Design a protein with these regions (language model features):
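Hydrophobic packing positions in regular secondary-structure scaffolds
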Residues: 2-255
Length: 255
């Protein structure tokens, strides 16, 4: 379960204007799903989301119900939470499953939190077992905890591995996140002991041990930490990411 990274080749200089909204509204009225799909596919997801947010509620509902129009997961996660919730009410369970299967776990949890309870079990039961169990575990924690914020897609490497072993593993393993800037280093108990930027791995000799190139982990986020405490931690220590650990200090995710 991972959001495919396609945005790098999308236009980021889209000029938003009311005239384009009028065109999109007209295409919705004419059931021209192909035009909208093609237009959105050429834009950065944030721009497509901006257009959807500027439509009237009735036009958004009509857009979602158009035949042959499926909202791109990359666009969906760019929408503000209130619009996401509104759109979810107009989507079938199958459509929600299709979106969730292509999202990182933290985004999937955010969506499931807004799904009516009676539909949640149907959606979860339609997901692959591995994804379903991971999401159920996150949902078992209180809403305002780190567990609901964390991403379960991360890259972890044993501290006794060499740089060469690590590079070979990263090349061969198909289940890793498609993009990552930081690698977590773990001991034999899967406790995080450090981090290494992926760029440093690529520039270090193959026989170098990962333990010698890592920066030791200073701050770990308990899985049940309140999300306000997490936010303060990131702000106070200027963090870009942090390891999330369970009660046994095992690495279970990242924020």
């Amino acid at each position: 379960m991972s959001l495919t990274k396609k945005t790098k080749d999308k236009k980021v200089n889209f000029e938003f204007n009311k005239e384009y909204i009028r065109i999109v509204t007209s295409k919705i009225a004419n059931n021209d799903a192909q035009f909208i799909t093609n237009s959105f596919s050429e834009m950065h997801p944030a721009d497509a989301a901006d257009i959807i947010e500027h439509l009237s509620q009735n036009d958004r509902e009509s857009l979602i119900k158009l035949n042959n129009f499926n909202i791109d997961p990359e666009v969906f996660v760019e929408l503000n939470e209130s619009i996401q919730t509104e759109i979810i009410t107009n989507l079938s369970s199958d459509s929600i499953v299709s979106i969730i299967k292509n999202l990182d776990s933290d985004d999937a949890i955010s969506i499931l939190e807004n799904v009516p309870e009676e539909d949640k079990n149907n959606i979860l039961s339609s997901l692959p077992p591995k994804d379903r169990f991971a999401l159920l575990e996150s949902l078992s924690y209180p809403e305002d905890t780190a567990a609901r914020l964390m991403q379960r897609e991360f890259t972890a490497i044993p501290s006794n591995w060499s740089v060469g072993q690590t590079i070979d593993y990263l090349r061969e393993n198909k289940d890793l996140p498609e993009e990552f800037l930081e690698i977590f280093i773990v001991n034999e108990d899967f406790n995080p002991v450090g981090t290494v930027p992926s760029s440093k791995v690529l520039t270090s000799p193959r026989d170098t041990k990962m333990a010698t190139v890592m920066s030791e982990s200073q701050l770990l986020v308990p899985v049940d930490m309140d999300r306000e405490e997490v936010a303060n931690l990131f702000e106070n220590y200027n963090l870009n990411s942090a390891a999330v650990v369970d009660k046994n200090n095992k690495l279970v995710g990242m924020i």
